[in-house]
């Protein structure tokens, strides 16, 4: 799935999109993957131009979210979109770091209890444990993925995403979005 999505985004938006067909379970690897490259700018006003990296946390456990949170806090500039859902409900949070400052809280800042969770990485679970760990419905997964795509689309096409967080329930067919408060968006 990751390979196909990366290839589609790269083709449609004429940009570089990377994927890794493996679990990332250490901070050094993740930090290396999200490092923004830079190059000399054409204008004196912008002597150095940096890539804008978007980390999409499509993970199914809090230990992986804790790792993404640590990488977010170490990053100079990063957009971190995290989607999480259970069987019928979930949320998508867009965190932003700019020039070493947190402009918008990431998922760990919005839901600090997940930073204390004691679960395991997917590679540490047996097949039986993994299948029982967190029941999810196809509708909740599709809803979370659609919100992530909308956020990324707005960043790539419109240059910003004004949505900080979207909570949803597929059982009650409800969606609620918290917008930026007249500050620069992602």
Regions found by a protein language model. Name each.
Residues 1-17:
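Glycine-rich phosphate-binding loop and adjoining beta1-alpha1-beta2 segment
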Residues 20-30, 38:
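Conserved SAM/SAH-binding loop
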Residues 34-42:
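Conserved amphipathic alpha-helix within the SDR
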Residues 28-33, 175-179:
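Short, solvent-exposed polar/charged micro-motifs at secondary-structure junctions
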């Amino acid at each position: 799935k990751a390979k196909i999505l990366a290839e589609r985004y790269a083709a449609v938006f004429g940009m570089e999109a990377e994927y890794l067909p493996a679990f990332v379970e250490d901070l050094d690897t993740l930090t290396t993957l999200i490092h923004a490259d830079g190059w000399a700018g054409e204008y004196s006003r912008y002597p150095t131009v940096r890539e804008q990296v978007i980390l999409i946390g499509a993970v199914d456990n809090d230990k992986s979210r804790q790792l993404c949170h640590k990488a977010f806090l170490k990053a100079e500039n990063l957009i971190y979109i995290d989607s999480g859902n259970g069987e019928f409900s979930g949320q998508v949070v867009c965190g932003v770091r700019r020039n070493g400052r947190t402009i918008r809280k990431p998922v760990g800042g919005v839901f600090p209890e997940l930073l204390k969770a004691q679960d395991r990485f997917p590679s540490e679970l047996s097949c039986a444990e993994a299948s029982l760990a967190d029941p999810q419905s196809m509708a909740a997964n599709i809803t979370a993925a659609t919100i992530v795509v909308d956020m990324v689309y707005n960043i790539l096409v419109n240059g910003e995403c004004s949505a900080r967080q979207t909570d949803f329930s597929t059982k009650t067919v409800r969606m609620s979005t918290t917008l930026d408060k007249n500050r620069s968006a992602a």
